[in-house]
């Protein structure tokens, strides 16, 4: 089999005041290679999104969303150091359609590592009161000195179940610069709104 890695866990989002969202990610990470499967705690991520511009009439919002990933992983399942991300996001809503995206600078210290730019864009449409679908494209620079940048494409959905639950899913191909076989990314989550 091929090598793979990923994580599962809990992401907590809290809005203590209007225009501010605090996010903490508490992952359980895994990695699989020819020697078998390894599980353990992943790196904890913490960020704060501050919406500094919002216009209901135009349906336009701008936000900064800086974050840190703390070196809390066990069993070599994390970065091994604190990393940071300094992005800016924009969103435009028009009826049942939304276009959103942005990007920023990733701070990735460490031997053979490098800082890099990353960003993406998505378009979504509310198909019904319960179902939203969308398409996304993301681009990331190389995160190591000898590494390659990558591009991923995806289709996603949010299905609003009975209150307070939402089911989120997305997936699609990923392409590394320099060729080679395409990879695949997949995300699924159960949202709970309290």
Predicted features, each with a name:
Residues 1-194:
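Transmembrane beta-barrel domains of Gram-negative outer membranes and organellar outer membranes
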